[in-house]
Amino acid sequence: MKKYTLIFILLITAVFNAAGCRFTVREIGFSILSQDIYTLAVIDEKADANDSFWKQFHNRNRDCNLRLEILNPVHDAEHPVVKNAKQHGIKFPATVLIAPDNRLYLFEGNNILKIYSEILESKLGLKMGTLFPDIFAVAFFVEGKDARKNKTALIHINKNCADIENLMPNMPKIIKNGPVVIPVSTGDFKSEKLLLWSLGIEKVPEEPLAFILYGRGRIIGEALGFKQITEGGVYKYLSMIGADCECGLDRKWMLGHQIPLLWNMDSRQHLTKLVGFDVDNPMILAEMSRILAKETTAGATGSVAFAPETIDLDKTFGNQSSGSNSTSTQQPENEPGKALIYSMIALFLIVSLVGVFILFRKKN
């Protein structure tokens, strides 16, 4: 019987391993496995954390990556946020936003609803939040002071996005809409100052920059400067997003820095319909975590390091046709739910065959 049990276990393992990777880098980007939290801190002796207004505000933002803290500058004097504010010479009462890397932004005035709108409801922030579930990714283009370089960089970004869109039918999962370019002109800096601040930009850069954002407002890699943009950096980063999660990509690239993003239950339900599973489901998160842990157990370092030799883009997605606009016929999306159903059917058949075999052996 021990021999039959061992065979049974090996068969089950083979079935689930044969199912392959269930998720793409893009899909993992929607998860909360590693979430950048922005803290909006109201530091005020008179503010009461138990006030119904603050509780309503907290509930309203439960599903996005903005958290509210009500702190008393006297009773909470040793709180890291209060100490950080004091080190910056901030006088209380004050309302500050703390980034995941502990950078601090001081607001003028204490109108919490206006501040909330500045953080999560800027024109471009709302646009991206609406687009992310339906598109491949966003190429966020920040204009610099040099108009000529701005024009050149935008041409390269648009071409790279078009090239990726041509490759999308050959990627592990089909996405209906390709990358979208969202430019930020120098005239947008005031209205988008907090979105830009979250990306580390506090003034108009000398040269244009590009950020590739996907999933739940995640950045893959780092900011791309003018030289990197003209050398195909946008294409390289976008290609990584289309790969499956076992492509050898460093975990820190798949779960990169996030911008503050308005995300609610409607966003979650809409995404679930599109990808075929709930990215916030504990079982899905456990499976994603298992895959990522396996991929990064060996050779993990403290810094982000892209190793081109671990990802053969031509082999993964097919050769890129230079200047070609042809696209392949799109195939139905290989949803994880379908893969699981097929695996369970195969498992049922195997168990039935093993059972019949054991019964036959006993009779003889």
Language-model features: locations:
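Bacterial N-terminal signal peptides
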Residues: 7-15
